Amino acid sequence: MSGLRQIAFYGKGGIGKSTTSQNTLAALVDLGQKILIVGCDPKADSTRLILNAKAQDTVLHLAAQEGSVEDLELQDVLKIGYKDIKCVESGGPEPGVGCAGRGVITSINFLEENGAYDNVDYVSYDVLGDVVCGGFAMPIRENKAQEIYIVMSGEMMALYAANNIAKGILKYAHSGGVRLGGLICNERQTDRELDLSEALAARLNSKLIHFVPRDNIVQHAELRKMTVIQYAPDSKQAGEYRALAEKIHGNSGQGTIPTPITMEELEDMLLDFGIMKTDEQMLAELQAKEAKLAVAQ
């Protein structure tokens, strides 16, 4: 286990976290690294592009079929994908029943006890980040993931989620070794997105590791259940993911203890960048619109 780097990709649902992480890990394996992916998102889509398949059976689903986790063997839950990347999905309960984070806790314990972490250079956790509840915070809380990479964009809710995740990291940074490795901006083509991402990273005492430009080739690859690295290895977008992988690979020991900001500070930052309008601006726009309508009548 010495030399093992345990990283985690956090981010709000729908931000492109699983796509970004799988493309980055596919690029990382090309750097000669042995990788284990542990999917910690109830959607169980953290390994699909690596396996070139539909979502794999999850630890919780298989445990329910067999009776309990103790009845499972490692080969039941571990699948081998692109260039021998090992893949596991923890899964979650049926919607509205139980805690989705429970699958994360159960899976990580099972994998550790059964030797899944042996002979790998990286363990990567792909974690839902809209809420940093006990279960989803488990890779942070139990000092499993030492480097957290937050996938975000210039959209307000993505920024809000990134700040929330930073709060979760801060909570456990002093009791364990967890650090914020940096922010990854998955471009949504919003106003001043790069500037805003760099500004938030600075406010969080971190850095923007990479700005991933938007490219339709990502969707083309996804439709074929492939990463861009596999589908179009010579494309410009594949080069972006390789650059991101190299930055993460060279970022060992560079993580920081984050300094999250308040909701008011986040809103002020958006106002400074002209992303959010003040009440006065909105009122003035409304009055101008009403005046225009009155003239037209």
From Swiss-Prot:
Q: Where is the signal peptide?
A: none
InterPro entries per record: NifH/chlL_CS, NifH/frxC, Nitrogenase_Fe_NifH, P-loop_NTPase
Instruction: Please state which protein family the record places this protein in.
Output: Belongs to the NifH/BchL/ChlL family.
Q: Where does [4Fe-4S] cluster bind?
A: C99, C133
This protein is called Nitrogenase iron protein
The gene name reads nifH
Assembly and interactions?
Homodimer.
Required co-factor(s) are: [4Fe-4S] cluster
Q: Which SUPFAM superfamilies match?
A: P-loop containing nucleoside triphosphate hydrolases
